[in-house]
Curated annotation (Swiss-Prot):
UniProt similarity note: Belongs to the protein kinase superfamily. CMGC Ser/Thr protein kinase family. MAP kinase subfamily.
Free-text comment about domains: The TXY motif contains the threonine and tyrosine residues whose phosphorylation activates the MAP kinases.
UniProt cross-references to CDD domains, sorted A to Z: STKc_TEY_MAPK (cd07858)
Lineage, top ranks: Eukaryota, Viridiplantae, Streptophyta, Embryophyta, Tracheophyta
Listed name of the protein: Mitogen-activated protein kinase homolog 1
Length: 384
């Protein structure tokens, strides 16, 4: 349990209470009690709580010094902008973002999500038996959430088992949208690290100038293989080794299957690799359902233009018993995530403040009244 503490300056802000957790101060809205630590990492510290007003169980993520690293600050801003618009059973819901006390100098950001029990990475490495029904249901939900994202014009770009949250009912929700981009974004191409290496599509490993929704499909294929085999299918040690592992399993590619590689040096490297006949997925995963193997090999196709789409995957015989297109509407409107990568800290902070206001309409109204009164007072200061 977190330890209640006094505020650092001795002055208690109305509506806030204070906790110490892993030597970090949490300044939490009083409607959230009790506060229990869950985990910590490079992303920040996470605790569980209950919203007393709604009785909902939530996860509170504190991002400490959110603006210390500009790239990380942009990731947080991007996630805020995106999750405000997304509403889907298989996408994590951002319930609240706590209102900072100081608009122009706040450093920490507190994000409040719906609470989940674990993630797919933890399940894969556990001793928990996974039946075909488990594998099928996890994949179905992942594809269903991804179809929704793609219908909103969004590429996730960082799908991996650790970014798929699971609860005790085996419900799955996609999370961590800090690397997400609109699929038509003009500055999306290889501007930064994209997708954890083991789940990175060949077109990204080969630094192709153009990529699309098929990069997410490749990641889904890698994740599904991990579930079937209970270990990573392509655990590369670095970029070139990653490509070698892919070719070893998929087999050497024909000339027409590498035409998408626009970099001559990259194409030459692929052609220089020793010949591999490939390894059938049915041999790698002998206990998997034959239809699961068929769908897997349609997702893990080297040439992105020949890779199965999310919609096609949902209509595949392995998924069709679960999929009903009539209960799976697309996103209402495409979402634009284009954000200037060169924004300075002050601008990012102000944009984040504006996003936070969407979760606090009462604060937004109070701010409008304040501006209104200030405008009324301006003429009186200049009267003779």
């Amino acid at each position: 349990m977190a330890t209640p503490v006094e505020p650092p300056n001795g002055i208690r802000t109305p509506g806030k209470h204070y906790y110490s957790m892993w030597q970090s101060l949490f300044e939490i809205d009083t409607k959230y009690v009790p506060i229990k630590p869950i985990g910590r990492g490079a992303y920040g510290i996470v605790c569980s709580s209950v919203n007393r007003e709604t009785n909902e169980k939530v996860a509170i993520k504190k991002i400490n010094n959110a603006f210390e690293n500009r790239i990380d600050a942009l990731r947080t801003l991007r996630e805020l902008k995106l999750l405000r618009h997304l509403r889907h059973e298989n996408v994590i819901a951002l319930k609240d973002v706590m209102m900072p006390i100081q608009r122009r100098s706040f450093k920490d950001v507190y994000l409040v999500y719906e609470l989940m029990d674990t993630d797919l990475h933890q399940i894969i490495k556990s001793s928990q038996t996974l039946s075909n029904d488990h594998c099928q249901y996890f994949l179905f939900q992942l594809l269903r959430g991804l179809k929704y994202l793609h219908s909103a014009n969004i590429l996730h770009r960082d799908l991996k088992p650790g970014n798929l949250l699971i609860n005790a009912n085996c419900d799955l929700k996609i999370c961590d949208f800090g690397l997400a981009r609109t699929s038509s974004g003009k500055d999306q191409f290889m501007t930064e690290y994209v997708v954890t290496r083991w789940y990175r599509a060949p077109e990204l490993l080969l630094c192709c100038d153009n990529y699309g929704t098929s990069i997410d499909v490749w990641s889904v294929g890698c994740i599904f293989a991990d579930v079937l085999g209970r270990k990573p299918v392509f655990p590369g040690t670095e970029c070139l080794n990653q490509l070698k592992l892919i070719i070893n399993i998929l087999g050497s590619q024909r000339e027409e299957d590498i035409e998408f590689i626009d970099n001559p040096k990259a194409r030459k490297y692929i052609k220089s690799l020793p010949y591999s006949p490939g390894t059938p997925f049915s041999r790698l995963y002998p206990n998997a359902h034959p239809l699961a193997i068929d769908l897997l090999q349609r997702m893990l196709v080297f040439d992105p233009s020949k890779r199965i789409s999310v919609m096609e995957a949902l209509q595949h015989p392995y998924m069709s018993p679960l999929y009903d297109p009539n209960t799976d509407p697309p996103a209402q409107v495409p979402i634009n995530l284009d954000i200037d990568e060169d924004l300075v800290e002050e601008t990012i902070r102000e944009m984040m403040w504006e996003e936070i206001l969407h979760y606090h309409p009462e604060a937004a109204v109070a701010l409008l009244w304040k501006l209104f009164y200030e405008l009324l007072l301006v003429p009186s200061r200049h009267r003779p």
